[in-house]
Amino acid sequence: KDSQLQYVKRDFQKNIFNELSRVNCQYIIIDFFVDATQPLIKTNDNNYVSGNLHLRETKLLKCWKDIDFIRQVENEEYFIKWKEDLNIYMDNISKIVPLEKIILVKGRSAYAYKDKFGNRHNVKNPKLSIQQNYFWERMNNHFLKSYPRVKVIDMTEDFWIADFKHPFGASLVHYS
């Protein structure tokens, strides 16, 4: 899909800041879903891109040689790299909008979902959701400690049920 290609291209070119400056946005809404749930890909020339679904669905990933997948779970290397990248990201974003106009959406992966018939099921691998949510919360906490002036929408207080009929597709963070 063209939208997936644009997403992957943006990740490689690291030009999101230019795009955001051009559109003169008033607020920026962020979350750490991809950061907390998808691996980081380290190329043989020490570049990093997110191992998101859009990239994994392309043929590009199969063409790479000597790449490493750095996963979050029990991996301090990932968290250190993430904190370094977060600082660079926030330095750039804060030139586009003030910190008070940045909104963090605190989310989490659901432990249950509704199938296409509306029947509720527990996730097959709750341990994975627990690990991802722990890491996601760790990222949120670090972010809020480092940037206390940002605003927050907290969606972690309720236990959401994922809905596999969600318009954006099946995911444990697409709630009903």
Predicted regions and their residues:
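Basic, amphipathic N-terminal segments that precede the first structured/catalytic domain
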Residues: 1-26, 165
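Surface-exposed cleft-lining segments at the edges of enzyme active sites
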Residues: 3-4, 37, 55-87, 117-130, ...
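Structural motif
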Residues: 26-29, 101
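Short, solvent-exposed beta-strand-terminating loops
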Residues: 29-59, 108-111
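A structural motif corresponding to the C-terminal end of an alpha-helix
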Residues: 84-104, 138-153
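Acidic carboxylate-rich catalytic motifs and surrounding loops in phosphoryl-/glycosyl-chemistry enzymes
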Residues: 104-108, 148-166
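Substrate-gating cap/lid alpha-helix
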Residues: 112-154
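Histidine-centered active-site loop/cap adjacent to the catalytic His
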Residues: 168-176
